[in-house]
Amino acid sequence: MSFNHQEIEKKWQGYWEENKTFRTPDETEKPKFYALDMFPYPSGAGLHVGHPEGYTATDILSRMKRMQGYNVLHPMGWDAFGLPAEQYALDTGNSPAEFTEHNINTFRNQIKSLGFSYDWDREVNTTDPNYYKWTQWIFLKLFEKGLAYVDEVPVNWCPALGTVLANEEIIDGKSERGGHPVERRPMRQWMLKITAYGDRLLEDLDELDWPESLKDMQRNWIGRSEGAEVHFNIDGTDEKFTVFTTRPDTLFGASYCVLAPEHALVADITTAEQKEAVEAYINSVKMKSDLERTELAKEKTGVFTGAYAVNPVNGEKLPIWIADYVLATYGTGAVMAVPAHDERDYEFASTFNLPMKEVVKGGDITKEAYTGDGEHVNSAFLDGLNKEEAIAKMIEWLEVTSAGNQKVTYRLRDWLFSRQRYWGEPIPVIHWEDGTMTAVKEEELPLVLPKTDNIRPSGTGESPLANIDEWVNVVDPETGKKGRRETNTMPQWAGSCWYYLRYIDPNNSEALVDPEKVKQWLPVDIYIGGAEHAVLHLLYARFWHKVLYDIGVVPTKEPFQQLFNQGMILGENNEKMSKSKGNVVNPDDIVASHGADTLRLYEMFMGPLDASIAWSENGLDGARRFLDRVWRLFVQDNGELSEKITDAPNKELEKAYHQTVKKVTEDYAELRFNTAISQMMVFINDAYKAETLPKEYVEGFVKMIAPVAPHIGEELWSKLGYNETITYASWPTFDESKLVEDEVEIVVQVMGKVRAKLTMSKDASKEEMEQLALEAIKDQIEGKTVRKVIVVPGKLVNVVAN
């Protein structure tokens, strides 16, 4: 008979809730273990089968660690601000807060139905004013340190959505959400100076136990490069511009310069003859995203401005072009072009028939750019030097003549922190009529998002908050000065930058987190989530953490010691699950038909945790069959414990049991859940063949399967006679000496041909081996004379007889 999953799951979920089984105490002598999941955005679609994969992994670890005597912090919460709720509100007229609350309730019920051991007393919600009070507090600290500032920046403006979009939210020049056209326009935006932390964000990666591929993604995103800034005067004017180059040694080979179309100097330096062509080109660029302008651009485009720059090193006049592959937001928005030694410059020069001048020997510039090292030529005081020597000498010359200086730059840009939306944290700043701006006082936080029915975009580029006069207009009570509140809101990234800290002390109204508690719990021991957050979320969270470290709020330099990305669960046809393809699997249906324990077991058994694997109904059925086999082995049809279970030891199961404890313990710790489950299956097969089952082994097995299948684990534990939960029972241990083979298989040969195989003690003497071997093959050697017996201890006996 199989078990009734619906009955058992309801029973134990009720028990855990009533007894607060997973409540994490703060004061404890035990060692700590902090297991963190990337908290979900509570969408209208509810939980999908991809969510529980990572959640089950952290839950198995959390449950094992509790049994190993750790105090475990394993929390859950909601990343609940964001565009979808606002779009829904615009489309339906309902409030984003109601929509979000409804979705959170659905998600919470779904997550609870899967039996995860979260401490729900620590639940956080980024849209709760008691939570975002501290998101705003962190913003004030950034503002005080000069790390939050206002700037005019070219942004991706989407008229249909009425907001600015990040590069990542744009695909092929259209918004990812809704497919609306996007254009570039300069706007006043809040920026966070993440670049000030570039070196530390880069260097501290070395100390982390993260996948190397993920560290590389962060390193590339930060993109540190060393080189020089060079100042170019514009011929016939007092104007100048600066370029950054990693190859100042090639300055003698510069043959033209390129400015970004948005560069502030373009309008001033363009000649009357070129004005029309330049303006037409600038307009054509407005519709392109940064990605389309750089990495996706198939051919180089550009226009000559009519102006010339003066090369500081030799006085040569270099034509100034504009081209979309140079971005105003990257570097200085200007480049010196050395087509003989740079592939991109070479393509551009070839397209527009611009001159090339070789200054490093080693290639054939009639065929392609030469970017390697070599002897410098046509370079006056650099002639004969190699690349490294020439770079050092040129930087020295630039600094002596004030024509430039040594410089380190980053690919990393400052973080565009404002959104023209309603559903986000208000930025606690007031702009006064005299042009000054001040932060809201700490004691006035949280600055609460006002309730309103009118969340349509203002159309001016400001957020819908600009429509709420009574909220936006303020008067200074001391001076009578008038002001307006900042109407931009924070991006969804803000609340998720620090949520792992709030779980440590979720109800503290006096501080972001208690210093003693944060010292106890940090760093997070393991953080599991999807690879789609590999760069931005993790980089932003590390940045905020370092700022909090600098002001003494947190005691560690890094937030997450170990990080792991789970793979994706694909549809049965190996395609990504999506509503449009109709291949989405709803976990609620599986919980109803097969049970939560089966879903958890199946997702862990599908394959390695970091692999992307297709969903399979057959695999799901197989997982349920295994749990049924476990149940039937231990429980009779009448619900009583199997009569095979006894207090007596069983030598034939001893080795299999100790092997299983060792492998499961090690595999769980290393996140190799699929192989741990395989080993448990092997043990159950052995146990079915055994005459009796020692109770000690049954209890040990139940403890091992409980982290994966907690409901059946609890039910079997109670059937074994225990009144309290299995949660804090002690984890089984193994004896290394029991893993050693006592017996070995010996091959018996006659004249070199195998005639028998014998099992005997591994310590058997040569005499014993010979005696047993001759006994086993006496039929084969009857009537023959044994000339010689060769014995290899522990391996074989070869009999020479004729």
UniProtKB/Swiss-Prot annotation:
Record localization: Cytoplasm
What are its E.C. numbers? 6.1.1.4
Residue numbers of motif 'KMSKS' region?
Answer: 576-580
Question: A Pfam family name for this chain?
Answer: tRNA-synt_1_2
Membrane-crossing residue ranges in chain numbering: none
Report the principal subcellular site.
cytoplasm
The record, for SUPFAM superfamilies, names: Anticodon-binding domain of a subclass of class I aminoacyl-tRNA synthetases, Nucleotidylyl transferase, ValRS/IleRS/LeuRS editing domain
| GO CC entries | cytosol
Entry keyword annotation includes Protein biosynthesis: yes
Q: Which HAMAP family match?
A: Leu_tRNA_synth_B (MF_00049_B)
The entry's family comment says: Belongs to the class-I aminoacyl-tRNA synthetase family.
**What is the name of this protein?**
Leucine--tRNA ligase
Q: What species was this sequence derived from?
A: Bacillus cereus (strain AH187)
Chain's gene name: leuS
